[in-house]
Structures are given as C-alpha cells and as structure tokens.
Amino acid sequence: MKSCIFHKKYLLAGIYIIFVLFTCCNSRFYHTPLAKICSVTEKQTLSREGTRGSKEYYYTQNITARILNGPHKGEKITVSNEYTSSQVQTKKYHKGDTVLLSGSKESPGKTIRSVKRDGYLALLAGGLFFLLICITGKQGFYTIISLILNTVIFAYGFQAFIEGKNILNICNVIAVLFSLTTLICLNGIHRKTFSSVLSTLCVLFLIMALFEFSIYMYGDLDYSNLEYLGSTGNSADIFWADIMLTGLGAIMDVTVTISAAVGEIVRKNPSVSLRRLIHSGREIGYDIMGTMINVLLFVLASGMIPMFILKMNNDISFITIVRYHIPYDICRFLIESIGIVLAIPVSVFIASAIMKIPSRKRGVRE
C-alpha cells in the first residue's frame, strides 16, 4: 500500500516537472511573436528631480534578441526599451528573458510588450496542485475541482456582464453557485454542507441588507474617487457586487468551521442538548472570529501598500489618503467583519437545528 502511494507521488512529481518544462518551451504554440534576449546594452539618458529630494533616472536599452517562433524563427532582431529607475510604469529587461513582441509571427515588431510569464505561473500553480494532492490526497483533488469550477463560473459571470446583463443579478447567481460548488465539492452531500450553504446565504443577505439600510439612512457613497472604475456609469452596483463577493469567502470559512464542529459534537454525543450544542458552537465561533477579522485586515493592508507608498512619495499625506482614497476599502472591511460576527450566531443556530433532526427523517449522511 505504501509503495503504491509512493509510486503515485513520483508519477505526480513527473507530471509536474513535464508540465513546467512544457510551458518553458511552448513558443511554437504562441500566435504572438516571442524572442529570447541575447544581449543588452544600456545608457543613462537624463535625470529629473523627484519629490523629497530624490532623483528619477531614465535609461535606454539596446536589446538584441533571437526570435523563437514563426517563419523568422532563429533570426536576430534589435529592439530598444526605455525605463526609469523606479520602474513604476516601465520595466528593465535582462539577458535571458523571454519576451513578447508587437506585430505578428509573420511580421514581428520591434517593440517589447511584456515578459513571457507562463513558466512562473505553471511553476506556482503546478506546485500548489502537486502539494494539495500529495499532502491532502482526495480532498486536495476536490479542492482543485472546486477552484476550476469557480473560475469557470466567474468567467461566465464576466462574460454576461460584458454582454450587458445586470451586474447585481449576475452576482446574486454566482454567489449562490460559488457556495454550492465549493461546499458540495469539499464536503459532499452532508447535513453540514446544507447548514453551511444556508448559513452563508443568510449572513450574506443580512450584511447586504445592512449596507442598503445604511445607504438609505445616511446617503450614498461618493464614488468619484474610485479611479479603477474609469468611465463606467454603474459605480454603486459594481461596489455592491465587490462587497458581496469579497465577503463570501470569509463568511463561508466561519460557517463551514462551525457546522463541521457542531456535526462532530452530535456524532460523538447524539444525546447532547440543543442548548449545550449552541453554547459549544458559539465558543468555537468566538475562537476563530478574531483570527478571521485580522486576516481580512492583513489582506486589506497588504493590497494597499503599493498605493500608499506611491502617493506618500508624491507628498500626499497619510490622512489625505485615508480620507479620500481608501474609504471604500474601509467600508468593505467593516461590512465583511460584521458578516464574520453575524456568521457565528446564524451558523450556530442553523447547524444546531439541522444536526439535531433525527437522521432517519433525512436522506443524507451525518
């Protein structure tokens, strides 16, 4: 049995290595012209005074690269690239980089679009899948399936939005699909799955109702500073959908943990009273509540670090950034934190009620 498991792990490791090597050598399958940089020479062209006494240096690179695909494969081409020392909006290229060129395979251009990155993605994604299956076995496989299905659902949702469908209706549907797909794939058809799905949707409804009520009482947010929305005319709907989908994962984590714990308590002690069961589930929820809220805070803070650095480097004060540039992130964090807190009593009550129903009256497993 152990030898069989080791053979499977070796097979998975071999598949992983082949997958990574393939993505590093798949130039022939690209429709975009690719080239590998053979040599780079550069010179400084000018420098400008920046904020806080710093200097920004400008460089020009003369790059010789060898074309990797198309009818011009093997030919050398010379391209130029300009970049700044901060590399905020430009990039410095190095010898050995594989880059995507402008134009087509039949007529490659002399401008670099970007670096070919599928090798890095294959290394990381393949490593994740390999570790999931090797460490957690069948559960890891189901996790991968749920990731793939959720990605497909997300892609269909975006496609529907591009086709002109209402984004709120789309998000309502995909929120339900995300919950069902994730929980059924990971937990199967169990009581704890039904209680987790029901708890997640109830909490999601409560926090969105609270958000709508606060807007109704105190007025809508000012969306003029949402720079990433550009010229879209439905900023409020997009922000509403953003809150719904962002909070879904954290809420689902709490409801699954509590439902699984309550189910295990009932399985070990079927005669436990409903009051005692609710008390135990509540204590479990309190243990994970602080951790989950802090996880949300860390995710929020880490995502804002580049923006904070750039704006403060341009003499925009910390208080100004907080007042005018991140109120939406703060609002999102507060609503999702409220969702985590609400998920505890809601999931405890629903899970306790469902788990205490006699199993002979239901056609699903404990």
How would you describe each model-predicted region?
Residues 283, 287-290, 299-366:
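Hydrophobic alpha-helical transmembrane segments of membrane transport and translocation systems
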Residues 1-34:
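Hydrophobic secretory-pathway targeting helix
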Residues 34-93:
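Membrane-cytosol interface segments
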